[in-house]
Amino acid sequence: MTTVRTGGAQTAEVPAGGRRDVPSGVKITALATGFVMATLDVTVVNVAGATIQESLDTTLTQLTWIVDGYVLTFASLLMLAGGLANRIGAKTVYLWGMGVFFLASLACALAPTAETLIAARLVQGAGAALFMPSSLSLLVFSFPEKRQRTRMLGLWSAIVATSSGLGPTVGGLMVSAFGWESIFLLNLPIGAIGMAMTYRYIAATESRATRLAVPGHLLWIVALAAVSFALIEGPQLGWTAGPVLTAYAVAVTAAALLALREHRVTNPVMPWQLFRGPGFTGANLVGFLFNFALFGSTFMLGLYFQHARGATPFQAGLELLPMTIFFPVANIVYARISARFSNGTLLTAFLLLAGAASLSMVTITASTPYWVVAVAVGVANIGAGIISPGMTAALVDAAGPENANVAGSVLNANRQIGSLVGIAAMGVVLHSTSDWDHGAAISFLAVGLAYLLGGLSAWRLIARPERRSAVTAAT
């Protein structure tokens, strides 16, 4: 392995054997495998939820922990993982994360009880937190030219979206044929291929002497964990129960201490200087609302089809396929239209489209024709397929390639917090309503409003500043 100067402040290592002419498709495949595994482990668990409930005799609260426990450690550790990537190198942290995720997936498959599965899912989330921001950083440095990078972001998102779209169907088939354990064993060959390709073909980025804000990260973790406990356990224990009120108090205290610390130290958890730019703030706000809506609705639909409509896991996966397959198709379309329209314009238009489609389902009942549900959710996912790469491109444009590690960590953290809150909120709705139809209707209302708020945020913080910049440049 030899080290070469790649320009600016970074260096890169030439892959083993001195090869530097690695095809773009090979690089994208290597860097997408981590995201594929992380995405699969949300979508396939949603379809397997009812089977896991029956097999391990879990409550709805425990099932929510199985899904959200993964997202909790994922969101909690993303910022710390971004700092580690800066300190010891993105490639090293990416491979570490893949290894942890690989072993945790095996532990999930072997889990004999709900408690053991929850613990393994927590470790899985930690592994995902390590490789997610490093994946974006490695992609940015692998494709330094902006136009090519934008195309590669679209292709990268399409690969991930395809796995997300096929995840419910593949997961349902595997659960029906081999049991719920098989959805975690699926990660083993994917992880092995991804680690081998990354080690062989992806060049390393330069490490930087960075102080890790460990006390701040610990407060961040405590605050998120306490909020998660209150949201997930509240419906079962009661919102005024001692443990729930204590969790809220711990969350508020940890958040207050974190805020005080952030204003007094030179190495804060959040890169607050980046939030001075409206594009960076807008991309992160859109990321939170987008994941709240997308993963909250996916969690709800996986259970709704099985409990309210009597579908098997495989049938539920097939029923979700026409709705989710639009997501990767739209990702590919984004790669073609991104040169004609600004990211802010695309985000605004397609967030509003997704919101309108979701709100059209607030009258859903068990007798609503399947094709009506499929069309509405499918249209929403057309919007989602544009939104995902669009927000990432807007973020990179706002932060600059030199801040890719930390910017990717912030965006992914906000997105996963959105997933965490969205899944927990849908769990609260389904636990608190009198029947599945009522729960689904309220869920679609929340999802639609989240998309619409995201659209307004994209217009105000991304699209309008882009137009002002374009006018200024023209004059």
Swiss-Prot record:
Main location: membrane
Membrane topology: Multi-pass membrane protein
Signal peptide: none
CDD domains tied to this protein: MFS_MMR_MDR_like
Localization of this protein: Cell membrane
Transmembrane region(s): 28-48, 65-85, 93-113, 123-143, 152-172, 173-193, 212-232, 240-260, 285-305, 314-334, 346-366, 371-391, 416-436, 439-459
Keyword Transmembrane (UniProt): yes
Any GO molecular function: transmembrane transporter activity
Record-level GO cellular component terms: membrane; plasma membrane
Keywords for the protein's UniProt record, in alphabetical order: Antibiotic resistance, Cell membrane, Membrane, Plasmid, Transmembrane, Transmembrane helix, Transport
GO biological process: response to antibiotic
Keyword set includes Zinc-finger: no
Function text: Resistance to the epoxide antibiotic methylenomycin A; probably by mediating its efflux.
Family according to the record: Belongs to the major facilitator superfamily.
Protein name: Methylenomycin A resistance protein
